[in-house]
């Protein structure tokens, strides 16, 4: 069954029209068998024998079973009689011409039939990554037959009335998007109380063959009853309570979202349901959150790869629509009862701009979207039909401004209104004409001779002939809708609107305009909420709540309870003074606070207050389940992340934005760095100042804070490339923090600031790493007031820049620093000598690693099995240690599409936390290491995972060439012209390695070659004390894959070099003059001698044979004989250099950094 609401069974007639029939009660003879294994037997005889045994058992059951059978027979007769009566009634209605029918276009039927007949689905296909679908084939029949004639007849009769099991073919689109909702394409009624779940699945049944084989019906029904399979989908059979039931299934991902702190206060929050549980809907980054306030549970609607830009809900709160902005943008419709995505629109914006505004009709049949492109498009979607194209589309002129709000007429789903800040547009949809007409009168100050103000929101007036548009000047523009009289024979034109009057409601700007029951409701920038009747007369208001600017108002779908003697509804402000009876509602404010107002007694409850600005700083307590979250708005909040309980917070004075947070190793202190350079040391349990005054030794944002292992030192780094150190001293018998010294030690931004311990003592050591490729050690013992001593400086990279640094866990006898760089590499440096001991391919998920931490061990048994948690630009991931380049040892998931600002790991290693920066959220991820280990096991052993990194794999052309070059290097090292017996071995000398590397397309620099030599030579030195001077083919393959650029030679890297070295020529391209090009080769970087340069050009221009330099028998052209002025053009561009001079085949992958 598809995961959607089931519609009542339809009787299909020859003319292609359908009549809706009421859903029948299930027959009591449908009951589950006690031995479900019988359904899996394919042997017909064995199946029949089991049926005989069950029948004999049933005869011995007693009088109760006999009575049930008699009742079943009676129900069967009643069902048959009802069917006959309804068939007669339908014929009478059809004859009298009073039957309301929905027409299916012949072309649509034909196309759908062809699709159903030709497409075959795979039995293992998965829908939406959640529920597997069984194999469906309309021509395949099950061989199981019934022997009991009475049961056979009963099932045959029921199969014509009950909803049939969806075992027919479905299109791949239905599989992929799990969209079981169907409607005929004919015009639907404008006013209807029937919800879409009464129509879902209708189109597929309309397109079914009239006469399905009775044998298949019997077989389907029988298998369904025997196996206990529900005849209803999960979406149609669920209740509201199922969403928050605990999922006991085993996790299937290494990282699973368990909680999201914060919310996107620029989007609305909706009141989903209230009866037994208070449930809200809001957005965090790219995830929609369904939050149960009473249970303190969250359910996450995950499916978007970009930040969600808008969302809406149906009037009954059953259906949720979300949309995003960015590449491959999606529109997803969800079932709020189950959390299942019932339909996905993949190509809503082919240009990739995303959706700016969205609305759903009150009956939830149609969805309207407005794109966020420069030329906006208004589209109306019949989403219940699971179509991939809109029913109609309208492009808006750019002079209308950016339309950022849209809503349907609640009583006519063919009318809409939208507005930008300066223009309101009325739409009328003519479905039969495939036309979306619009009217957008120009409104200026001269229209009413008064200042109108900028529009905020618009709604349809309760009197059905007017539209209201609210402005930021506290006014309402009233528009009259002029509809031409309806005529069956002639078309009298499209409707249009005209500005009628300007009503000055209040002084405060109106930010929210909506309707509920018989009231028009406004919310303003001062936090006031006011209610007006249809004449725009004030009825009541809430002005004493002391709220921020109103961002959203969402009223409960449950009507207000009638007043009783115990009720405490306030009186309205009319002369009669009637009780102001109103639904409860949710209030969302621009300062990221959400409130619930119980109108009976006017009880305001604060549900949560979250940071209203970017969240860049998070830190986990070292031995308690606490997380501190800091925001640019100056708020620090501390949560217990085990029970999801907010504990305490502190809001600093205006202008102090929290940029960095770190607990000290004892967990007693919390260091906080601020955007304007201030450093606070706070008590971790109260957030009160530990020092009398904060430290102010920087003028720029403090980006890093770190404590030494004994909490005697604290170091900070800021955006002016400066490292500052603070020290704990004893003054007058009290321990106080004092400033020690600071030093601008880097030329570019500091990426890591790390304390460690010296191997020969327990003294702390301090290291800093910058994008200037410098690793700097500081001498804390020799430092004194205002003088921070530098111990040593080392270069970490040549072309790429380092991104982060962490102490490598003690998995080996050697102590390492693990440094990640912008070239997707992970490097291990000896902690003492700073020699690069190993270079490895790190996780490559679209951007380099930006931060990483070693996952704390959970037990002593796990000391030899360690893991890294890392973040890159938009993802969080896990990496199994030791890193060896195996791509199956890592996994990542999108956590914040617009960028990750920070990361933290719980003290027990169970959770990772990511801060989303400007998306104002922090996500908690549960770590399941067993899933990642399973992926490694499935990826293969030894070299199997590495073969997948080669073009063509183990049997491909590239690997064959690599083998040829490897063994050819043995011949060359022994001499090409030697007459002695060849000694073929499994190894080559290290001196041959650079030549083989270059022969297969990897051109390492001299520094990289030295790193490769050191890596191989000292690979076993610590364990054996011996140096290695040769390498075999498997080890060579690993070295090659770990050292080469992960995406090959890219034009982006060459273009970046020309951006730095070149000038802009007459064609607008970066170029280098020939003289400058030759001068750079012999003077900059790993410069050549002039002879080496000329020899290289001779080889590149084909003047020297291959292998000339190492094969004495070959003759070569002397470099002095080459005339470079003739061979090289006057100016050299990146394309000329790559293709004409070097002769490279360049990859089009140009989005990687550091290549």
Curated annotation (Swiss-Prot):
Biased composition (Acidic residues): 60-69
WD repeat residue numbers: 341-383, 391-431, 442-481, 499-534, 537-597, 601-641, 647-684, 694-730, 737-780, 791-831, 837-883, 889-927, 965-1005, 1025-1065
Cellular localization per UniProt: Cytoplasm, Cytoskeleton, Cilium axoneme; Cell projection, Cilium, Flagellum
Segments of skewed composition (Basic and acidic residues): 1-19, 31-59, 70-95, 201-220
Alphabetical keyword list: Cell projection, Cilium, Cytoplasm, Cytoskeleton, Flagellum, Repeat, WD repeat
Keyword Oxidoreductase set for record: no
GO biological process: cilium movement; flagellated sperm motility
One GO cellular component term: axoneme
SUPFAM superfamilies for this protein: EF-hand, WD40 repeat-like
Residue spans of biased composition, Low complexity class: 99-111
Annotated region described as Disordered, given as residue ranges: 1-144, 167-225
Pfam families, A to Z: WD40
Biased composition (Polar residues): 118-128, 172-182
Keyword Metal-binding: no
General function of this protein: Involved in spermatozoa motility. May also regulate cilium motility through its role in the assembly of the axonemal radial spokes.
The protein's name in its UniProt record: Cilia- and flagella-associated protein 251
Organism: Pongo abelii (Sumatran orangutan)
Lineage of source species: Eukaryota, Metazoa, Chordata, Craniata, Vertebrata
């Amino acid at each position: 069954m598809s995961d959607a609401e089931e519609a009542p069974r339809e009787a299909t007639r020859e003319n292609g029209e359908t009549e809706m029939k009421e859903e029948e009660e299930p027959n009591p003879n449908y009951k589950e068998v006690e031995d479900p294994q019988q359904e899996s037997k394919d042997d017909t005889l064995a199946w029949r024998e089991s049926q005989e045994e069950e029948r004999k058992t049933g005869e011995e059951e007693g009088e109760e079973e006999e009575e049930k059978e008699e009742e079943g027979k009676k129900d069967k007769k009643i069902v048959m009689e009802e069917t006959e009566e309804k068939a007669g009634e339908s014929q009478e209605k059809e004859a009298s011409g009073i039957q309301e029918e929905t027409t299916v276009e012949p072309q649509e039927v034909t196309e759908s039939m062809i699709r159903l007949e030709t497409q075959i689905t795979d039995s293992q296909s998965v829908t939406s990554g959640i529920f597997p679908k069984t194999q469906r084939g309309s021509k395949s029949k099950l061989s199981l037959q019934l022997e009991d004639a009475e049961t056979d007849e009963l099932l045959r009769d029921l199969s014509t009335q009950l909803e049939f099991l969806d075992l027919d073919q479905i299109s791949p689109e239905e599989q992929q998007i799990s969209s079981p909702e169907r409607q005929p394409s004919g015009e639907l009624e404008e006013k209807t109380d029937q919800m879409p779940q009464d129509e879902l699945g209708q189109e597929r049944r309309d397109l079914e063959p009239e006469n399905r084989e009775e044998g298949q019906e019997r077989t389907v029904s029988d298998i369904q009853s025997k196996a206990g399979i529900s005849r209803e989908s999960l979406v149609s059979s669920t209740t509201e309570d199922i969403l928050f039931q605990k999922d006991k299934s085993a996790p299937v991902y290494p990282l699973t979202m368990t909680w999201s702190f914060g919310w996107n206060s620029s989007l609305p929050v909706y009141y989903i349901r209230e009866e037994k549980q208070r449930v809200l809907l809001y957005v965090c980054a790219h995830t929609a959150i369904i939050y149960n306030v009473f249970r303190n549970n969250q359910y996450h609607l995950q499916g978007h790869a970009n930040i969600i830009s808008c969302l809406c809900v149906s009037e009954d709160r059953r259906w949720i629509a979300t949309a995003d902005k960015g590449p491959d943008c999606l529109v997803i419709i969800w079932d709020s009862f189950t959390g299942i995505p019932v339909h996905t629109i993949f190509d809503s914006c082919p240009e990739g701009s995303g959706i700016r505004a969205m609305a759903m009709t009150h009956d939830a049949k149609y969805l309207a979207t407005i794109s966020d492109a420069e030329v906006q498009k208004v589209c109306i979607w019949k989403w219940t039909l699971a179509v991939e194209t809109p029913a109609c589309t309208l492009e808006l002129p750019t002079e209308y401004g950016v339309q950022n709000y849209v809503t349907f007429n609640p009583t006519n789903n063919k009318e809409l209104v939208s507005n930008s800040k300066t223009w309101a547009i009325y739409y009328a949809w003519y479905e039969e004409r495939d036309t979306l007409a619009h009217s957008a009168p120009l409104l200026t100050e001269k229209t009413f001779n008064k200042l109108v103000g900028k529009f905020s929101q618009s709604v349809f007036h309760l009197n059905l002939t007017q539209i209201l548009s609210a402005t930021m000047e506290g006014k309402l523009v009233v528009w009259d809708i002029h509809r031409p009289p309806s005529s069956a024979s002639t078309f009298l034109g499209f409707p249009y609107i005209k500005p009628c009057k300007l009503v000055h409601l209040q002084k405060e700007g109106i930010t929210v305009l909506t309707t509920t029951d018989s009231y028009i409701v406004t919310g303003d920038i001062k936090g006031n909420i006011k209610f007006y009747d249809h004449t725009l007369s004030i009825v009541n208001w809430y002005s004493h709540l002391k709220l921020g600017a109103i961002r959203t108002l969402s009223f409960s779908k449950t009507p207000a309870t009638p007043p009783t003697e115990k009720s405490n509804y306030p009186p309205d402000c009319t002369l009669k003074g009637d009780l102001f009876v109103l639904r409860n509602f949710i209030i969302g404010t621009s300062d990221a606070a959400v409130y619930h107002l119980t109108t009976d007694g006017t009880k305001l409850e604060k549900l949560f207050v979250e940071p209203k600005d970017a969240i860049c700083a998070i830190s986990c307590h070292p031995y308690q389940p606490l997380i501190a979250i800091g925001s640019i708005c100056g708020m620090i909040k501390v949560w217990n992340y085990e029970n999801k309980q907010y504990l305490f917070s502190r809001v600093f004075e205006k202008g102090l934005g929290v940029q960095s947070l770190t607990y000290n190793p004892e967990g007693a202190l919390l260091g906080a760095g601020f955007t304007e350079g201030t450093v606070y040391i706070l008590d971790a349990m109260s957030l009160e100042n530990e020092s009398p005054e904060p430290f102010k030794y920087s003028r720029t944002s403090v980006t890093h804070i770190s404590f030494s292992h004994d909490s005697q030192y604290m170091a900070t780094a800021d955006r002016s490339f400066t490292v500052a150190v603070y020290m704990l001293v004893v003054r007058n018998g009290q321990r106080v923090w004092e400033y020690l010294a600071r030093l601008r030690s880097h030329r570019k931004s500091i990426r890591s600031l790390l304390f460690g311990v010296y191997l020969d003592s327990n003294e702390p050591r301090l290291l800093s790493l910058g994008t200037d490729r410098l690793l700097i050690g500081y001498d804390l013992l020799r430092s004194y007031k205002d003088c921070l001593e530098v111990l040593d400086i080392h270069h970490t990279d040549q072309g790429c820049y380092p991104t982060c640094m962490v102490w490598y866990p003690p998995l080996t006898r050697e102590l390492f620093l693990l440094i990640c760089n912008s070239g997707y590499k992970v490097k291990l440096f000896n902690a003492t000598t700073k020699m690069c001991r190993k270079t490895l391919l790190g996780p490559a998920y679209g951007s380099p690693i930006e931060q990483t931490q070693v996952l704390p061990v959970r037990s002593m048994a796990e000391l030899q099995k360690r893991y890294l948690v890392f973040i890159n630009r938009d993802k969080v991931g896990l990496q199994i240690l030791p890193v060896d380049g195996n791509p199956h040892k890592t996994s990542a998931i999108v956590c914040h599409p617009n960028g990750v600002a920070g990361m933290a790991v719980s003290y027990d290693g169970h959770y990772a936390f990511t801060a989303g920066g400007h998306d104002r959220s922090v996500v908690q991820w549960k770590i399941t290491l067993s899933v990642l280990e399973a992926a490694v096991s499935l990826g293969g052993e030894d070299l199997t995972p590495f073969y997948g990194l080669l073009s063509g794999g183990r049997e491909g052309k590239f690997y064959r060439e690599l083998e040829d070059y490897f063994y050819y290097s043995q011949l060359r090292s022994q001499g090409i012209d030697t007459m002695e017996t060849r000694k073929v071995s499994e190894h080559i000398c290290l001196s041959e390695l650079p030549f083989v590397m270059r022969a297969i397309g990897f051109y390492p620099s001299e520094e990289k070659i030295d790193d490769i030599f050191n890596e191989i030579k000292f690979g076993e030195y610590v364990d054996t004390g011996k140096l290695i001077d040769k390498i075999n083919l498997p080890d060579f393959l690993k070295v090659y894959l770990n050292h080469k650029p992960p995406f090959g030679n890219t034009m982006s890297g060459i273009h970046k070099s020309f951006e730095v070295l070149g000038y802009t020529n007459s064609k607008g391209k970066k170029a280098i003059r020939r003289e400058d090009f030759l001068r750079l080769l012999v003077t900059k970087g790993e410069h050549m001698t002039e002879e080496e340069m000329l020899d290289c050009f001779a080889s590149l221009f084909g003047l020297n044979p291959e292998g000339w330099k190492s094969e004495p028998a070959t003759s070569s052209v002397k470099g002095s004989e080459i005339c470079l002025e003739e061979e090289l053009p006057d100016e050299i561009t990146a394309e000329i250099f790559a293709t004409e001079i070097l002769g490279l085949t360049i990859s089009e992958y140009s989005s990687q950094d550091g290549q």
